[in-house]
């Protein structure tokens, strides 16, 4: 993995032969194993994850689709059938409603980002040339993003969005309750009261 990652020279298959043993049967297995290790390295890079997170925060869209065959059952969620909007602009009450729809098995939510922009950023971070070893690194980066980084960042972004939506909902409820508790019981009508404890 270090040999490929260094991206010096293209005699990778020749150099991979010394890693063939009882556990690693072929040169191809050795190269695949090395690419898996590189994918892990990319995934564990805090800098790489921060770049991906930044792109998602700016451009990720929340895609909401109705589960096939659930159109009638989930009619109350019909406003959200087959919609797409930027996650950062999604109102808290809409997000919470969509999440309820997903929990009830009516809606399916996904985050969609510009994968080509993400991969371009990652390539710039790790790929140093255009030879065979660099192409292998590019392949490992793509695998790392699709298999490891993307699912993790999507879960993180959705959890953060839900947490913020919950906070907004609680604040709104508290504000409405406060107004209700402090409102006069009979509105603007005048009330005459007698205090039985008052002595003359």
Give, region by region, the residue ranges found by the protein language model.
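Duplex nucleic acid-engaging cores and interfaces of nucleic-acid transaction enzymes
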Residues: 1-186, 190-192, 199-200
């Amino acid at each position: 993995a270090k040999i490929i990652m260094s991206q010096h020279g293209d005699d990778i298959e020749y150099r991979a032969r010394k890693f063939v043993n009882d556990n690693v049967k072929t040169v191809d297995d050795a190269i695949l194993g090395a690419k898996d290790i590189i994918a892990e390295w990319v995934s564990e890079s805090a800098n790489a994850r921060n770049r991906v997170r930044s792109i998602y925060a700016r451009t990720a869209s929340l895609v909401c689709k109705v589960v096939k065959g659930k159109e009638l059952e989930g009619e109350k969620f019909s406003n959200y059938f087959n919609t797409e909007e930027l996650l950062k602009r999604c109102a808290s009450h809409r997000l919470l409603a969509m999440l309820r729809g997903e929990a009830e098995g009516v809606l399916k939510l996904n985050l969609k980002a510009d994968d080509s922009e993400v991969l371009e950023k990652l390539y710039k971070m790790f790929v140093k040339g255009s030879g065979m070893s660099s192409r292998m690194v590019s392949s490992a980066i793509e695998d790392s993003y699709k298999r490891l980084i993307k699912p993790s960042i999507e879960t993180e972004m959705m959890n953060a969005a839900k947490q913020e939506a919950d906070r907004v909902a609680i604040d709104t409820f508290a504000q409405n309750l406060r107004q209700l508790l402090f409102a006069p019981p009979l509105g603007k009508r005048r009330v005459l009261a007698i205090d039985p404890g008052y002595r003359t």
